[in-house]
Swiss-Prot record:
Entry similarity comment: Belongs to the UPF0235 family.
UniProt-listed SMART domains: DUF167
GO CC terms: cytoplasm
InterPro entries: DUF167, YggU-like_sf
Cited Gene3D superfamilies: YggU-like
Annotated source species: Methanococcus vannielii (strain ATCC 35089 / DSM 1224 / JCM 13029 / OCM 148 / SB)
Protein name: UPF0235 protein Mevan_0378
Organism placement in taxonomy: Archaea, Methanobacteriati, Methanobacteriota, Methanomada group, Methanococci
A Pfam family the protein falls into: DUF167
Amino acid sequence: MIEEIIKKTEKGVLIDIEVTTNAKKNEIGKINKWRKRLEVKIKEQPIEGRANKAILKFLKEIFKTDVELNPVTTSPQKTVLISCDTKEYVVNILKREIKSV
């Protein structure tokens, strides 16, 4: 299932995510198999780009590399670009972080 939400590009690995704001804590949820997106919960409110900044900071801590929104959007459905060389790097981290694979 993880392979369905990530895609390798020249710049890194893209991950399709679905963001929930105003959460109790920042965390990686599960993979939504109907939307084919990784659930990411963020404490921050979606006001003036604060949630987007919180997403980037949180994912950067998890992946230990640069992360960017691709493109920046106000929608809860987003795609993030993880700066890394291999899909396997992202898959291994997601397997560790996802609540139920």
